UniProtKB/Swiss-Prot annotation:
Keyword Cell wall biogenesis/degradation (UniProt): yes
This enzyme's EC code(s): 5.1.1.3
GO biological process entries: cell wall organization; peptidoglycan biosynthetic process; regulation of cell shape
SUPFAM superfamilies the record matches: Aspartate/glutamate racemase
Pathways involved: Cell wall biogenesis; peptidoglycan biosynthesis
InterPro entries the UniProt entry points to: Asp/Glu/hydantoin_racemase, Asp/Glu_race, Asp/Glu_racemase_AS_1, Asp/Glu_racemase_AS_2, Glu_race
Keyword Cell wall biogenesis/degradation: yes
Binding, substrate: D12, S13, Y44, G45, N76, T77, T187, H188
Family named by the database record: Belongs to the aspartate/glutamate racemases family.
Upper classification of the organism: Bacteria, Pseudomonadati, Pseudomonadota, Gammaproteobacteria, Pseudomonadales
Designated name of the protein: Glutamate racemase
Catalysis: reaction(s): L-glutamate = D-glutamate
Assigned keywords, A-Z: Cell shape, Cell wall biogenesis/degradation, Isomerase, Peptidoglycan synthesis
Gene name tied to this protein: murI
Length: 265
């Protein structure tokens, strides 16, 4: 049995999961967090499910070696491809995945039209289709795949004209179709909230699932008597790409400067 003081592993294809990591640290400040950014293999959204599963297995094994008591897949595409596989491999390990916020969006919409920004992999998945079938029968859902958006966010330049232009091109058709609720279906996209605020009317609700994932992690840790006690926990970072690149982005997206180690698998 893992100890309460053991860390929690959090992974993403890149820096997008930092939006989830921030929610976890806000809700569970005593937890020690391990974050792996698989930047050397980004973007997951354009990779095959088998490729993504293999990456997630490597990272899960690394977290186990580090003594992690739980794992968070802070990536919608990774969850779609790998969460069932990982739960089979590690049946006693608390595992939390991501899914687009279809249920709260369907409840929130007034116009009956919901827009979804997500990766191609997420939107084409059976898991996403099942979410729509379960929660969105009474609303119109318009999906917008966003190739290239993750890569621009990974640069850390959230004010670049190229990023603004690309995002505008993805959002405008959804607004034109009457969307009053917008789902951010990728953990990278919450970093675009300031840009989106200038593109969409004030009455358009923007929904993501970072806070819900943090609450689910708290529930699972509590159910397994694994919630950390005592002093505030720290966060440690690894990347499968150049560590210096992540070091430069952390102050922008994480708002802190931390050391970054190389993850070689």
């Amino acid at each position: 049995m893992a100890e309460r003081s053991a860390p929690v592993g959090v992974m993403d294809s890149g820096v997008g999961g930092l939006s989830v990591l921030a929610e976890i640290q806000r809700l569970l400040p005593n937890e020690t967090l391990l974050y792996v950014a698989d930047c050397g293999h980004i973007p997951y959204g354009e990779k095959s499910p088998d490729y993504i599963r293999e990456r997630c297995r490597h990272i899960a094994e690394f977290f186990h070696e580090q003594g992690a008591k739980a794992m968070v897949l802070a990536c919608n595409t990774a969850t779609v491809a790998a969460v069932a596989d990982l739960r089979e491999l590690y049946p006693t390990w608390p595992l939390v995945g991501m899914e687009p916020a279809v249920k709260p969006a369907a409840a929130a919409t007034r116009s009956g039209v919901v827009g979804v920004l997500a990766t191609t992999g997420t939107l084409q998945s059976a898991k996403f289709a099942a979410l729509l079938d379960r929660f969105a029968n009474d609303v119109q859902v318009i999906t917008q795949p966003c190739p290239g958006l993750v890569e621009l966010i990974e640069t850390g330049d959230l004010a670049s004209p190229a990023l603004r232009q690309m995002l505008q091109g993805y959002v405008q058709p959804l607004l034109a179709a009457g969307c009053d609720t917008l789902i951010l279906g990728c953990t990278h996209y919450p970093f675009l909230r300031p840009l989106l605020a200038g593109m969409v009317p004030n009455d358009v609700a923007i929904i993501d699932t970072g806070a819900a994932v943090a609450r689910q992690l708290r529930r699972l840790l509590g159910a397994n008597d694994l919630l950390a006690k005592g002093p505030a926990g720290a966060a440690r970072f690894w990347t499968s790409a150049d560590p210096e690149a992540l070091r430069k982005i952390l102050p922008v997206l994480w708002h802190k400067s931390d050391d970054v180690q190389s993850f070689a698998l």
